[in-house]
């Protein structure tokens, strides 16, 4: 397999384009603090935060595929590329409405490899969390703000993991899935970055 094919496979398996949802709040908060110009912005903390958030998001995406296949949810979803009630103009683009990456079903990765990849992303996000912890201590001389940010990151991790993982499986509990997505991509990312 060529290098470009491997990149495309990685993008498909991880659903990398969807990480823009987690990057947007981080970039907004970073831009705000950078514009203030009163030493509240640290480029090193900002970069570490971006990578940590990306790794958490990718881990949640891959866990989502893992648990959806394991529980038979993806198999039951026959309207994977259903454009639903979209206007005719948008139907032409065959927008993905639901169903994850379908990477396991397409043979791009197997179920065990999916779990390993998700665990690897989460492990790496913890490593970045430690770097953020240390970097913030070097800048401020205090662990106070870092403990709050890491707590928020941990809550985000739990929401991402239990979005489709049993026994909680938020995505199938009448509105709790939507609430968890709102919390993870709204207040938690914004507060965690700040």
What residue ranges belong to the model's regions?
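Short, Lys/Arg-rich, polar N-terminal cytosolic tail immediately upstream
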Residues: 1-11
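The first (N-terminal) embedded transmembrane alpha-helix
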Residues: 13-33, 122-123
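Membrane-embedded alpha-helical segments that form the functional core of polytopic membrane enzymes
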Residues: 26-27, 38-63, 146-161
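Membrane-interface elements of multi-pass transporters and channels
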Residues: 34-39, 66-70, 74, 138, ...
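Aspartate-rich (DDxxD/NDxxD/DxxxD) Mg2+/diphosphate-binding motifs
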Residues: 56, 60-121
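Intramembrane alpha-helical segments
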Residues: 94, 99-194
């Amino acid at each position: 397999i060529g290098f470009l094919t491997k990149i495309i496979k990685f993008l498909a398996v991880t659903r990398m384009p969807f990480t823009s949802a987690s990057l947007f709040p981080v970039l907004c908060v970073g831009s705000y603090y950078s514009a203030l110009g009163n030493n509240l912005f640290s480029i090193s903390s900002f970069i570490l935060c971006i990578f940590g958030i990306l790794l958490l998001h990718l881990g949640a995406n891959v866990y989502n595929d893992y648990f959806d296949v394991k529980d038979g949810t993806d198999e039951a979803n026959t309207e994977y590329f259903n454009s639903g009630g979209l206007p005719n103009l948008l139907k032409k683009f065959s927008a993905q409405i639901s169903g994850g990456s379908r990477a396991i079903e397409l043979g791009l990765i197997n179920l065990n490899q999916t779990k390993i990849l998700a665990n690897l992303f989460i492990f790496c996000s913890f490593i970045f969390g430690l770097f953020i912890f240390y970097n913030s201590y070097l800048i401020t001389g205090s662990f106070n703000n870092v403990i709050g940010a890491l707590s928020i990151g941990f809550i985000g991790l739990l929401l991402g993991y239990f979005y489709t993982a049993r026994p909680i499986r938020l995505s199938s509990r009448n509105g709790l899935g939507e609430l968890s997505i709102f919390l993870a991509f709204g207040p938690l990312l914004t507060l965690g970055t700040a």
